[in-house]
Amino acid sequence: MSSQAPADKFSDAVPAEVVQIIGRTGITGEVTQVRVRVLEGRDKGRILTRNVRGPVRVGDIVMLRETEREARKIATR
């Protein structure tokens, strides 16, 4: 059992707005690759490529635990 309360898990998360949907990835397409603009924190204004699970559309706000990593680009075969 985790010692953290559910609200504590996202207390250090940073909000980011989805600005573009790039495509689907994952073996069965369960992950969406999106470009997001960081809204707060030291990387405010930076645009990142991230993978998101679940339904997402342009304008949605996603909470990022960290803003250092970017997702790899989707390779076309």
Curated annotation (Swiss-Prot):
Coiled coil: none annotated. GO terms for biological process: maturation of SSU-rRNA; ribosomal small subunit assembly; translation. Keywords: Ribonucleoprotein, Ribosomal protein. GO terms for cellular component: cytosolic small ribosomal subunit. InterPro entries: NA-bd_OB-fold, Ribosomal_eS28, Ribosomal_eS28_CS. The keyword Disulfide bond does not apply. It comes from the Archaea. GO terms for molecular function: structural constituent of ribosome. Belongs to the eukaryotic ribosomal protein eS28 family. HAMAP family: Ribosomal_eS28 (MF_00292). This is Small ribosomal subunit protein eS28.
